[in-house]
Amino acid sequence: MAPSQKRKAIDDDFILTISDNEEDIPLEEEQEVVPRKKAKTATQQSNKQKKKNNKKSKKQQQTEDDDDEAETKEDDAADLGIWGDNDEDDGAMDTEFQFVVDGQNEVDAEFDGWGFEGAHKGVVKGANAGGDKKAVDIDEIIRRRRERKAAKEGKTTATKEEEDKMEVDEEEDDIEEIDVDLDDDEDGVLADDAFGMGVGSDVEEEEEKQDAKMGGVDGEDEDSEGEDGEKKGEDEDEGDASDDDSVATAVEHPDDVQSSDDEEGIDEEEEAKMKEFFAPEEENQPKKKGEMSSFQEMSLSRPILRGLTSVGFTKPTPIQAKTIPISLMGKDVVGGAVTGSGKTAAFVVPILERLLYRPKKVPTTRVVILTPTRELAIQCHAVAVKLASHTDIKFCLAVGGLSLKVQEAELRLRPDVVIATPGRFIDHMRNSASFAVDTIEILVLDEADRMLEDGFADELNEILTTLPKSRQTMLFSATMTSSVDRLIRAGLNKPVRIMADSQKKTAGTLVQEFVRLRPGRESKREGYLLHICKTIYTERVIIFFRQKKIAHKMRIIFGLFGLSCAELHGSMNQAQRIQSVEDFRDGKVNFLLATDLASRGLDIKGVDTVINYEAPQTPEIYVHRVGRTARAGRSGTAITLAAEPDRKVVKAAVKAGKSQGAKISSRIIDPADADKWQAEIDELEDEIEEIMQEEKEEKQLQNMEMQVKKGENMIKYEDEISSRPKRTWFETQEDKKKAKAAGRAELNGVRDKLKSKNEGKLSNKDRKKLDTMQERKQERTYKKGSAERAGKGAVLNLKKVVKKVGRSAGPKKKGGNAGKGGKGKGRRK
């Protein structure tokens, strides 16, 4: 019949396309998904062929093959998984993507922290162009000096050995040949004993003594920490008198009083300004958006979720949960949260989500992120690149110290996001022809409280007046200011205020310790610091200083005492600064000696301890300094050497910590130990000066070589250099100096400003003005002591004396007058 013939034809065609060996089936046929109906049809055909016994042997053999294939397909059809046939990935969804990450620790273990890869391109190109200078290696200078010293001592040793040999030769002539050989060997051994082995044994004995003392000191420190509950009250009672007596003394930083007053309460006028300036509270708390427990609930795109998973972010922090939904709406944001809480991701994630839906036909720069320091910008660039690793979003890093040509080439490609410092951004904005800012849609100010200070006022004003006014602006900081007058500078439009934590709050896992330096012992800071670094905290430590010269001096001292360290401050070029951070991050050095350049935003994994060589100028800087440890839920310790000039900041930090339930304790260090280390440092004072002088000479030599190279290039490439357009700036050198002085005055207070006017000295007139101003600011200028409270004080005795004199003076006066004339009342009677 016709139908049967057609069916046979189909079978014949089907048979001819199948090979005898199933392993040789082409890949395209293997990837095809076979529907269930087709599998059932093949089964019915094979069953019909089984019932026919009059088929040829060849046909029967083929039917058995069809049987096996049909059974396999039937089983596959019954066991079809989520991917289709054979339960394998058909390419519809990436197998590496995970909606719920169970093994969070495994993800975190793979991520080693943020690197500075984004800055290496600019550094390398700058070095090739002759813009980079070699750093003077302090360790190399110390090594050379020790080698010279050892060689000198070796010559003296050789001279003494020759004299000894001559004496032996004269006394023992009979056994000259034998004894000379023996004496040579013995003298060699004795010389080694005298100059090598003896010194080594002395050093070992000293080290053993130090180790024994170390154990004792550690034990005492632990005991003192354990007895804080008992002894702390006594120390505070004893310290109250000294603190109260010193209330009227000169304090270097009177601005701290104003900051504490601002913290205690906001006046009604400022509160009214805030209500008018910020968005209403109802908009700050949308429905359940502040309570999101995972990034999946935020409806983020898959590439963004994959980027978050790659860096180990599985659960949003409070600032992220509150900020991301509001930022996606396009509203202006003023955000604040504790250090190490993920503020960078809080503004990077919504930016990436919005950029995924941008028009891609014409590349355009749409986002600008500004930071106050270069290191923070480099780190922010690393975070953004890592989170956007599964997208096509492009970034450009534009900071000072790196090659201008490399940055101009990247800006010519019109990247989606530019991460920059204010100065370099203005430079490109004015002098790079291919860089346009009229298409900017989002502006972010990281560490905004620092950016809004007087030091950045002119630069920030230049940027804000150039950018489009219809932009979205976001401000973030751990110590976000509440001053509306400052926030107005950023050009915000009804911003949403999001404070995930109270202002100036430290991490809950941070232990804060304070070492009190009694009056007269401020000069022993170096000894205290060396004792701490040698015996208590020996690795993964960041030490903060106020001044670059002190940080550099301690770098030399640490090198002389065999402590591996690196320094980080503004006098270093960018290549040296990056190298220092990377050496500390990779564990090549145990100590990082830094100024406040590294206090903001720097996220280095595994920092165990932060030491403040002296308290910073303000409580806000203290919060940022100690925030370099105890990040992202990890534990950490911050120890501060506090003397009388640091009293204001320390009191503010302790007060804020106690109100938040932070762990605060006082560490007691034996003054004898500090004096011992200080004495050793004082002995090396001449050597320290010589090392600094040798370093200065090497720098001068390098500078001369650079000037010679520059002159050669000026002659060789004169036409090319003269044809370049001159770079312009928006303010003169005088304006730059004024802005710098204003920033320094705001940071260090009025006293330092007056010092700079008088070349480091205060006149008596200025000193009296400052003392009078500080007396007016004090809440109380006098407090009764223990004697007055017990009724035995000088004031009470003075009152008794006055009363006694008043009573006795009256009768004497009357009696005296009467007696002189001899006509008193008694006489008359």
Swiss-Prot record:
Q: What is the lineage of its organism?
A: Eukaryota, Fungi, Dikarya, Ascomycota, Pezizomycotina
Q: Which CDD domains match?
A: DEADc_DDX27, SF2_C_DEAD
Where is the stretch described as Disordered?
Answer: 1-96, 145-295, 728-829
User: According to its record, what is known about the domains?
Assistant: The Q motif is unique to and characteristic of the DEAD box family of RNA helicases and controls ATP binding and hydrolysis.
Q: Which Pfam families match?
A: DEAD, Helicase_C
What GO terms are given for molecular function?
ATP binding; ATP hydrolysis activity; RNA binding; RNA helicase activity
Nucleus among keywords: yes
Protein family per UniProt? Belongs to the DEAD box helicase family. DDX27/DRS1 subfamily.
Bias class Basic and acidic residues marks the residues at 150-163, 272-291, 749-791
* EC number(s) on file: 3.6.4.13
Oligomeric and partner information: Associates with pre-ribosomal particles.
The protein's name is ATP-dependent RNA helicase drs1
Q: List the catalysed reactions.
A: ATP + H2O = ADP + phosphate + H(+)
**Compositional bias segments (type: Acidic residues):** 20-32, 63-78, 164-190, 218-228, 235-246, 258-271
**Keywords recorded for this protein, A-Z:** ATP-binding, Helicase, Hydrolase, Nucleotide-binding, Nucleus, Ribosome biogenesis, RNA-binding
